[in-house]
Each structure stands twice: as structure tokens, then as C-alpha cells.
Swiss-Prot record:
Keyword entries, A-Z: Chaperone, Mitochondrion
Protein name in the entry: Complex III assembly factor LYRM7
Source organism of the structure: Xenopus tropicalis
Role played: Assembly factor required for Rieske Fe-S protein UQCRFS1 incorporation into the cytochrome b-c1 (CIII) complex. Functions as a chaperone, binding to this subunit within the mitochondrial matrix and stabilizing it prior to its translocation and insertion into the late CIII dimeric intermediate within the mitochondrial inner membrane.
InterPro entries: Complex1_LYR_dom (IPR008011), Complex1_LYR_LYRM7 (IPR045298), MZM1/LYRM7 (IPR050435)
Any single Gene Ontology cellular-component annotation: mitochondrial matrix
Name of the gene encoding the protein in the UniProt record: lyrm7
């Protein structure tokens, strides 16, 4: 696949991920849309294959981080926040103990 196709595919993937991650949050959706478009326009005239592949790698990493790490929170009451976890969210089931360890 040539680089134009890869760039277009990444552009569309980032926008789809943005819509999924920031669902029902107009402010975050608009800010993410502007940032994605701005970054792609800034590098529109890039011709170096090495730089293009570096930017593609960076964009792919950003998409993965957005998809697996960002959690959307919704304010319900004055002191409550409800987190909406998606199926793509990276969940590590690591046991956690907040009690201090006993020293022997």
C-alpha cells in the first residue's frame, strides 16, 4: 500500500476512534477533530519516506493510546463522577493491596 493510502487510512481511523472515545462530549469531540486535522495539515507537504513512516507510527501509537487508555467520565451529582468503560479499554487485572507491608 502506498503512503497516501496509509495516511488516509490513519486519518479516518483517528476520527473514528475520536468519535468512539469522546462519544456525547461535544467539546472534546471538536477539540480532537481540530487537533487531528491541524496535525495532518501541518505535515501535508512532507515528502521524505522516512519522516512519513515516523509520523504514521506516531499517529498509530496515538490511536492505540486513545482507544485503550482514555476513560470518559460524566458528572452526575456535585461530588460524583460516573466512568464509562468501553470494551477496548485496556484493563490489567493486577491485585492491589493498600495495606503497608509488614517488615520481618
Amino acid at each position: 500500500m502506498d503512503s497516501r493510502m496509509k495516511v488516509l487510512k490513519l486519518f479516518k481511523t483517528l476520527h473514528r476512534t475520536r468519535q468512539c472515545v469522546f462519544q456525547n462530549d461535544c467539546r472534546a469531540l471538536e477539540a480532537a477533530r481540530r487537533r487531528i486535522n491541524e496535525e495532518f495539515k501541518k505535515n501535508k507537504s512532507e515528502c521524505s519516506p522516512a519522516k512519513i513512516s515516523e509520523l504514521l507510527k506516531f499517529g498509530t501509537d496515538v490511536e492505540i493510546v486513545l482507544r485503550t487508555s482514555v476513560v470518559q467520565g460524566i458528572h452526575t451529582d456535585s461530588n460524583k463522577l460516573v466512568l464509562q468503560a468501553r470494551k477496548d479499554l485496556l484493563l490489567d487485572n493486577i491485585p492491589f493491596c493498600d495495606a503497608p507491608e509488614k517488615q520481618t
